[in-house]
Amino acid sequence: MKFLTTGLLATAALAAAQEQQVLQAEDGMGQAPQRGSSIFDETLQKFQSSLEDGISHFWSEMKTNFKDYLPLISLPKKHTRRPDSEWDHVVRGADIESVWVQGADGEKRREIDGKLHNYDLRVKAVDPSKLGVDAGVKQYSGYLDDNDADKHLFYWFFESRNDPKNDPVVLWLNGGPGCSSLTGLFLELGPATIDKNLKVVSNPYSWNSNASVIFLDQPVNVGFSYSGSSVSDTVAAGKDVYALLTLFFKQFPEYATQDFHISGESYAGHYIPVFAAEILSHKNTNINLKSALIGNGLTDPLTQYPQYRPMACGEGGYPAVLDQGTCRSMDNSLERCLSLIETCYSSESAWVCVPAAMYCNSAILAPYQQTGMNPYDVRNKCEDMASLCYPQLNVITEWLNQKSVMQALGVEVESYESCNSGINRDFLFHGDWMKPYHRLVPSVLEKIPVLIYAGDADFICNWLGNQAWTDALEWPGHKKFAEAKLEDLKIVDNKNKGKKIGQVKSSGNFTFMRIFGAGHMVPLNQPEASLEFLNRWLRGEWH
């Protein structure tokens, strides 16, 4: 996850000038954000009288620093769309939407719910021998197209290595916002990694060992995805994910009958409550959603931000990164930070949520980032900030940018990048960063189990914060869950049986795990442990 700091004030998106809708309201984004200071002046004048003095001052500074010709949304990627004739399958959402059936009550209804007429799904059967990635495993890649909005989401599907006719299906989402899920594929939990010589190396701990896995580049303009428009908030992105899954399972009904689980890490702590709620809101669907998994996520900033100081100052199980003076400074800044987040929670307006993110990230996160330590792993220095402290991302990017790879996958953009900073900025300046998406979790828990897991060496979405928000969440099982004690989590599935890999607590449909010796990306640091808890979770343990 990339956290922007106040150094990006001058690049604020005018998207924030449009009032945001409260959570669960209808999506009313209106026209695309414009360039220039005139609309900024007009909108600022409209809202400034209702803002607190500090927040009003923030936006006044924005106006002063604003540049007329600054790009205000992430720029579209160069691309060439392949004709439908080059794809093995094309699924039309309009065809699905036109199918009506007779319900149990005798009334006619659509077979599958949702607005789908504007979506198509293009599918290519990938030849594993051309890429050397999990040879012998059935694979598909392609694009979900929103033809009305000119949006095109790339996906790559791997069938289970074990028993694909019966094994569950898992969707994997990386965070950012703006980071490609193909980084998760090749850096963390996919069937292969890429070595420094650009050779494909098999991963024995891949999550498709006992499940079929879909890696999705979302929102648009992330990874191999592209668009002439943009998505700048989590709710809008959820509509696309629902459409992708619906059309994919329509094309491949053999997977639709199996259990489906949605998973991800980092900013997926925002995505997954919204995406799961979107899927569960549809009564008639072909998505057999059974659970949700969030790894080292940002879900409830109001509860998580107070835990940054303890994690950085030696109270999270690892030596302190910051000196006592800096720790005291973070303590002194916390009250103002939490006040701003509370105001954001109350209004869910970009006018107050953006200042909350900017102030808190500057006062609470920046002191750690200035040390040169890896924000994703408190044990290590940051090797290369340009590659998010993981130089292997450069190798993965180089491999994915090979013409032979792009041709084999049916890619339509000219180049791949692991993370798009423009998307990160767009979400931040739409106020999405600090919004209370955790409020959707109780309704999700009513219908499916949820697992929150956290590597305990991560700073940026640390285990202390994730434990805190899960304990604080208001839901019918709150008291029992909060009172439950962490118990040892040990390996039971292989030759290392009995090895302690973490701690776990569970009550009702809610489970929290602390994974020892893992940073932000648990499958990267502890691949054996991650596959262990995944397999057991998919089998129904802890729920």
Curated annotation (Swiss-Prot):
- An MF annotation (GO) of this entry: serine-type carboxypeptidase activity
**Catalytic activity, reaction form:** Release of a C-terminal amino acid with broad specificity
Q: Which UniProt keywords are present, listed alphabetically?
A: Carboxypeptidase, Disulfide bond, Glycoprotein, Hydrolase, Protease, Signal, Vacuole, Zymogen
Subcellular location(s) per record: Vacuole
Q: Which stretches are tagged as propeptide in the UniProt entry?
A: 18-124
**Record GO cellular component, one term:** fungal-type vacuole
Annotated InterPro entries: AB_hydrolase_fold, Peptidase_S10, Ser_caboxypep_ser_AS
Q: Which domain of life is it from?
A: Eukaryota
Record Gene3D superfamilies: 1.10.287.410, alpha/beta hydrolase
Which GO biological process entries does UniProt record here?
Answer: proteolysis
Give the residue range of the signal peptide.
1-17
Record: glycosylation sites = N210, N509
Q: List the disulfide bonds.
A: C179-C419, C313-C327, C337-C360, C344-C353, C382-C389
Q: What class of enzyme is it?
A: hydrolase
- Catalytic residues, per the record, are S266, D458, H520
> EC annotation?
3.4.16.5
The question of whether DNA damage is a record keyword is answered with no
Which family would the database say this protein is a member of? Belongs to the peptidase S10 family.
Task: Tell me, in a sentence or two, what this protein's role is.
Answer: Vacuolar carboxypeptidase involved in degradation of small peptides. Digests preferentially peptides containing an aliphatic or hydrophobic residue in P1' position, as well as methionine, leucine or phenylalanine in P1 position of ester substrate.
Name used for this protein in its record: Carboxypeptidase Y homolog A
